[in-house]
Each structure stands twice: as structure tokens, then as C-alpha cells.
Amino acid sequence: MDNYRDENRTKGNENEVFLTKENDQSASYSARNVIHDQEKKKRGFGWFRPLLGGVIGGSLALGIYTFTPLGDHDSQDTAKQSSSQQQTQSVTATSTSSESKKSSSSSSAFKSEDSSKISDMVEDLSPAIVGITNLQAQSNSSLFGSSSSDSSEDTESGSGSGVIFKKENGKAYIITNNHVVEGASSLKVSLYDGTEVTAKLVGSDSLTDLAVLQISDDHVTKVANFGDSSDLRTGETVIAIGDPLGKDLSRTVTQGIVSGVDRTVSMSTSAGETSINVIQTDAAINPGNSGGPLLNTDGKIVGINSMKISEDDVEGIGFAIPSNDVKPIAEELLSKGQIERPYIGVSMLDLEQVPQNYQEGTLGLFGSQLNKGVYIREVASGSPAEKAGLKAEDIIIGLKGKEIDTGSELRNILYKDAKIGDTVEVKILRNGKEMTKKIKLDQKEEKTS
């Protein structure tokens, strides 16, 4: 569905991401997909960033950090009180010293056993982790400023990570992020033994930020398996493996916990804005980790690392796409090379991006009708929307019985709750009057040249 146009597209491989959470305040953090780009300059992000084309992000209010200096609060009175308390604590410590030793010994043994298990798992699984280099054509200009495609050459634009999840019939297949491979004229994959091979892009999907690559299985000795991300619990140990900052630090292992499940992030992609479900983790995720696996302690893929909060005052907030969302996308990309989605055929803008005087004076909206819904800028000729009688400057306020406030909500309902061939009811406002239209959803025809 080609709803959002170029004004929503991001530069290079960097995307704007916002945390969304119900009933939070209007503060927002900017975040970025974690792909290493050698030519990318550091960019500053403020608390609020204006976005064009109706890119709407929710927010997460994190409050005010309060730091208490240490060692500056002692007085004579508190020193005496502390001394008195120390005597009590000393007695308590003495009476439980043997138990403490047992507890400490038991804890150390547990940590050693747990650490050994993780080390064994990482050692076993590392051959399935790969580095991915995105090569893009760069024209060589002559002294007179002219350029020729004949003199262009592929140069490294960025790099990321991936994981081999399937091997059959002499081929191996890698899952990674779409933003790792997007725009590439060719792709190189670095394997565990140092071998570098050319990869073929089987298919990619910008709205879920996933892609599948194919390589020869000549040097592939290990395949990782998907786990069940619905079994994840907050506080559970997870491990991230990838190539932060490129191949020099290949297969770097970081450990953390599941900080939260069923988070929602609203992300601007080259295909428009979308909201995706993610796992939050504090396992260190750095530029170049994109596309690498988030693993449980059994060595199963429970997520694909995709993005992180990137702010000076923020530490340890990274996100991974859950394995249960990754698997069906990977399977469809393998079988069809693309994700087939229902198509309406409108170019749209969140209504709140339209000036209120235009909403009132031109669109005929008033009161509670203002700033809620999706403004149709253009209806594609021959599209399902045109056949259903939708027109430019209509406002979509409902789909399949659910209220619509933003394009992201419309897209989520359309892609998750409907399928090609369905006939759905669309509620609209036209000149301030509410009406309902029935649209038979179709698949967008790919342009051919």
C-alpha cells in the first residue's frame, strides 16, 4: 500500500523511532536503527523533532533523573547513629557468617554453572552468525564533472549482522534487517571461518524491517533455530551476538535481560510509517548489531535485534523483533520474495497535520471531528478506493468497526486484521457528514518496465 510518499522516507539507513505507550505524556525519545555506516555523520536529536508527511510517533515519558551525591550527608549526629547501627549489624553478621559462606559458595557455583552454559551455547552457535556488508554503486566523475555508469564501482555503504536459519539443497538462508540491505547493489556475507561470499537478496520487507538472503552452503556448518518468543518473561536472561562497528569486532557477545515484552514502536521506513511489536532488552546493542539474533539461554532465536534508543541520558534500551513475528515473514519471503498485503490505493496524511483552519473552512469539520482521522490527499485511478467511491479530501475515521485516528492505526488494522479479497467497511467524513463505504481489498500490482 503506497500511502505515504517520499516525505516520509529517511536518509541513508537511519530511521526515526518513537516509543508508544498508552496514557503517557507527550515527551518522546528519538531512536535509530543500529546499522554501522562509515560515512554517516553524527546527528543530534532533540526531545521533539518535527516530522513531515504525517509521520506520527507516540511517546514514553521517562520522568526526571535525580542524582544524590554520595558522602556529603554525614553529620556528627548521623555518625553516632551509624556507629550504633554498625554494632547491631556486626552482631547479625557474626551470627550468620556460616550461612553467608554457604550462600556465597552456592551462589558462586550457580553463577559458574550458568556462565559455563552460556559460553558453551555461544561457542556452539557462533558459526551461524554472519556479518553483512551493504555495497552501493558510486559513480566515478571525470575531471570535467561528467560521470558514466560504466565507471561506477561498488563501495561499502554500511554493515550489519545476520543469522543463518535454514539450509537445504546446497543453499543457506540468512535472516537480517531490511535496513541493513536496503539500497544495496550487491551484498557480501562474512562467515565464521573468515570466508567472504556474495549473497543474493531473496526478499525484503521495509514495513517489518526484515529481509532474507541466500548464499551457498559450502562453508556453512551451523544453523540456528527459532524459539517461541511468547514464552519470554521479563527478567529472563538473553544474549545478543553481532558485529558492532563492523567486521573488526565480529561475533561480539553481550548479555542482558528481557526488560519488557509486547512493546510497540512507531517507525518511519522507506515505505511509510508503521508500528511494530518489539522486545525490549538491556543487552548492549551497538551500530552493526542490526539483524543479529537475540538468543535465550538455550541458544534459540527469540528476536532479531533492530534498534535502540540513542540519547545522551539513556542507557540500555534496545529492541528486537520477536521470533514469532519474524518466522511467518521469513517463510513468506522465502516462498514469494515479497509480503503480499491488502491494497486500498490512497495517498494519505494524518488529519492532525492539516491546519485547523483548513479542516474547518475547506473540509467542513467541526468540534470532535477535528484532528482525528486520516486525510485522503489522492485516490489512485482504478484502485479499490476509487471503485468504492472514496474521493480526495475525504477523512477516514474507521475501518472494520475500529476507530482510526492516524495512518499508522489504519495500516495496522489493514495489514493485521484483513486480507486480500476481503470486503471491509470504511467510515469516512465528507464535508462534515459521516458515511460508510464498502471496499473490496485487492493486491497492489507491481510496476513493470
From Swiss-Prot:
Protein name: Serine protease Do-like HtrA
Topology within the bilayer: Single-pass membrane protein
Active site residues of this protein: 179 (charge relay system), 209 (charge relay system), 290 (charge relay system)
Reactions accelerated catalytically: Acts on substrates that are at least partially unfolded. The cleavage site P1 residue is normally between a pair of hydrophobic residues, such as Val-|-Val
Misc. comment: Inactivation results in compensating overexpression of YtvA, especially during stress conditions.
UniProt GO BP: proteolysis
Cytoplasmic side: 1-44
Residues holding substrate: 288-290, 344-348
PANTHER family per UniProt: PEPTIDASE S12 (PTHR43343), PROTEASE DO-LIKE 8, CHLOROPLASTIC (PTHR43343:SF3)
Transmembrane segments: 45-67
Annotated organism of origin: Bacillus subtilis (strain 168)
Domain PDZ residue range list: 348-437
